C-alpha cells in the first residue's frame, strides 16, 4: 500500500472516543499539516491542549458541543451524513489554548491542524457562513463548501474546504499543484484529503505525481480513507454511479492558495 494512503482505524482513546485517523509530522512526509478524525459516542468527551498550532474542529456528522473554556458553542453540527450535501458548523481555535468536545449525539469530528504562533480569537464558523461554489464544466464539475478559505483572516496558516464530485466526474482537475513557494505565481501548500463515498462500497482513483515523477502514486481510495499530498499534482476520478466527498486541509509558509496546472492537461480549460 502506498505510504500516501491511510486506512481508517478504531483505536479507543477513552470511553466512547475512537481515533479513526491521525496524520502527523512524525508519521508522514508533512511539515505543516496535521489531521485527525474522531468518532464519539453520545455523551463522550475529548480534550486537547494546543501549543504552537491552530485547529479547526469540523463537525462532519452528528451534533457536538465545543469549548475553549472561555466560549462554548452548544449543539453544533447540521447533518447525519455528509451526503446531505449541506454545509456544517466548525470551530476555529488558536494556538496556546485548550479545547474540549462533547458529543450530543453520535458524531464524527475532523481536527485540522497547522502551525500558529500569533494567537487569534476562537470563532464559530456557522454552516450558513460557508461560501458555496460550483466549479468546472463537462465531466469536471464539483461543488465546494469553503470553511476556512484564504479570503477569511480568521486563521494564521490553515485552509479548510469540503468538495462534492458527481458520478463520472473528475475533481482537482485539470491536475494542479501548489508545491513551490513562488508567489505570486504559485504557493507552497501541503494537503490532506479525507474521503467518503456514496454508496459506501464505492471507490475513487487519486493520483499524486510531481513533474520529475519523484512522486508518482495512483491509489484506489475507499470510503473513510485519507490521502496525503506532500507535493505534486493530485487529481481525483469518480466512477459512474458513485458520489465523492472529501475534506481538504492545506497549510504552508504563506496562507495563500495559488496553484499551477499541469501544462500537459491545461488545454481542457480552453474547450
From Swiss-Prot:
A Pfam family recorded for this sequence: KduI
Entry EC number(s): 5.3.1.30
Involved pathway(s): Polyol metabolism; myo-inositol degradation into acetyl-CoA; acetyl-CoA from myo-inositol: step 4/7
Sorted UniProt keywords: Isomerase
GO terms for MF: 5-deoxy-D-glucuronate isomerase activity; glucuronate isomerase activity
Family that this chain belongs to: Belongs to the isomerase IolB family.
Keyword Isomerase assigned: yes
Transmembrane intervals: none
Keyword Isomerase (UniProt): yes
Reaction it catalyzes: 5-deoxy-D-glucuronate = 5-dehydro-2-deoxy-D-gluconate
UniProt xrefs under HAMAP family: IolB (MF_01673)
A GO biological-process term: inositol catabolic process
Name assigned to this protein: 5-deoxy-glucuronate isomerase
Signal peptide: none
The organism's place on the tree of life at top rank: Bacteria
Biological role stated in the UniProt entry: Involved in the isomerization of 5-deoxy-glucuronate (5DG) to 5-dehydro-2-deoxy-D-gluconate (DKG or 2-deoxy-5-keto-D-gluconate).
Gene3D superfamilies: Jelly Rolls
